[in-house]
Amino acid sequence: MEQKQRRFTKNIFVLDANAKTLCGRIAKLSSQPYCQIKIGRVIAFKPVKNPEPKGYVLNVPGPGAYRIQDGQDIISLMLTPHGVEATTERWEEWKFEGVSVTPMATRVQHNGVMVDAEIKYCKGMGIVQPYMRNDFDRNEMPDLPGVMRSNYDIRELRQKIKNERESAPRLQVQSVAPREESRWMDDDEAKVDEEAREMIPGTSRLEKLREARSNVFKEVAAGINWNLDEKDEEDGDEREDEERVKTLSDDDEQGEDASDDEHPKTHITKEYVEKVAKQIKLKDERFMSLSSAMPQASGGFDRMIVTKKLKWQNVPLYCFDESSKRYELQCVGACERVAFVSKDMSLIILRSAFRRL
């Protein structure tokens, strides 16, 4: 059983100073300025002295077809010298003059007491005479350029579009891994990672993650020596690599010569690669034009972009000089401050042991 739509009462106070309509004549005979038309569960029609709060005051010069438009509310009235018709339902077979509403703050007498009230004032021009037939047939298709008549009527077409939309496959990706990763993050990193995840939709976020891992880091695995400019297969360069490994080692006992079968040791740790990956995924506008690069044991930079307070563990720590724009590896450990610097068109992330100004 369909539930009937709730009907709200509308109060229209017709002000016809010339007394050319039935409303104006009744008000004049009763020595009152207004004629009230109440539309709701019941219909009332009477002359009144003043409008009620939240009522519509319709000022008309004479007979006409008026349509009051107040947001979603539409009230259609036919005012003639001998009759009145009004409705809040659809009434499309006649032409109407659209009348806009202006809310006003006023003081009116209501139930014998002067109160502050809001009324809605609208003024008609009488340019549309009552009962002028609307020549537009809703069932007739007009001749429009580039438009052809459909084989469906409007209801069937809407239902067809709705069924197609509901039957279309929806890609739903549920990722649990990122939430598991956030359990092992520091509080500030987990908050930043969560905000970045909310800004990027699910499917787009996965694509960005794959792109960051494949393109930005170029399939880098922990343990690979990034000092490519210094790498050579000659015996002299092997001795230099061996001395550099001794400098970077935390343990003084790791002074043995590296054999040809072993991979060369490096200061780039797995934790560092993971932390940098998460920073790149944040898509900071200050870094968008720069490509990611790994720092060497020592080197230079062009400018300091920003310094962030982040707690990182088991990462290479650097001492960098802002005046000479040089940095140098000190050890592998924990830090609470990270510097973002640029070299040419590359972004380098340095964990700060301390710095010289």
UniProtKB/Swiss-Prot annotation:
Molecular functions (GO terms): RNA binding
Which Pfam families would you find in this protein's record? Answer: BTV_NS2
Keywords linked to the UniProt accession: RNA-binding
SUPFAM superfamilies in the record, alphabetically?
BTV NS2-like ssRNA-binding domain (SSF110132)
Task: Give the compositionally biased regions (Acidic residues).
Answer: 230-241, 250-260
User: What segment(s) does the record annotate as region Disordered?
Assistant: 163-199, 228-267
Give the family from UniProt: Belongs to the orbivirus non-structural protein NS2 family.
Role: Single-stranded RNA-binding protein.
This chain's protein is named Non-structural protein NS2
Organism source for this protein?
Answer: Bluetongue virus 10 (BTV 10)
